């Protein structure tokens, strides 16, 4: 479900492909509901080893992150700190990952490329950038850690299935049409760079 509340665009799981149609690159959204941390080794297990994720992320969100967790009593946990890790490390797995899992929202640090663009366009998903630098504050948006799976991987790689409230801000970097904000910005940057370089060369031509 997608709602606009107090000027915020809020995605609440379960999220449909239809919910994402009006969301474009550069938009800022927030997430309510189910989000699972999922990074390098979990992607490898699913894509390379053919192992099914023990957490159902269909129509939900994953977060490329390695959080710090505090164990509590009765097999409960508290999120202490959670910041994004570089999404590009998952790029070679992401098409198959989205295809197999049906995940709708991928959250991480930095941009992604063709595999993720194609997955978002074909299967109706988006990639969002989560601003780094406030990992302790961001942990407060995690209301509960519901489940912890693949604990044999250690704390950073465990699948921490969380319930979140207005998790964000999330900047949409790839939308459900496959448009890529980072790649478009590179084109604009290079146009300006070439013009600026030409002007500088005119002004310092006497150095030759």
Predicted regions located by residue number:
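Short, well-ordered loop/turn sites that connect or cap secondary structure elements
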Residues: 23-24
């Amino acid at each position: 479900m997608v709602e606009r509340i107090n000027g915020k665009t809020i995605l609440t799981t379960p999220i449909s492909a239809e919910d994402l149609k009006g969301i474009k690159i550069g938009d800022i959204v927030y997430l309510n509901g189910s989000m699972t941390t999922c990074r390098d080794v979990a992607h490898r297990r699913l894509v390379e080893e053919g192992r099914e994720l023990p957490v159902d992320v269909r129509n939900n969100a994953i977060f490329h992150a390695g959080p710090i967790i505090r164990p509590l009593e009765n097999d409960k946990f508290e999120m202490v700190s959670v910041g994004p890790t570089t999404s590009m490390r998952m790029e070679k797995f992401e098409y198959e990952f989205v295809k197999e899992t049906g995940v709708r929202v991928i959250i991480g640090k930095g941009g992604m490329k063709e595999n993720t663009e194609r997955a978002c366009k074909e299967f109706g998903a988006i990639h969002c950038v989560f601003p780094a630098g406030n990992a302790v504050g961001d942990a407060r948006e995690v209301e509960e850690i519901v489940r912890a799976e693949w604990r044999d991987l250690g704390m950073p790689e465990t699948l921490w299935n969380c319930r979140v409230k207005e998790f964000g801000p999330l900047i949409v970097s790839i939308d459900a049409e496959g448009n890529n904000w980072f790649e478009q910005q590179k084109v604009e940057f290079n146009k300006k760079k070439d013009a600026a370089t030409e002007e500088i060369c005119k002004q310092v031509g006497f150095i030759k």
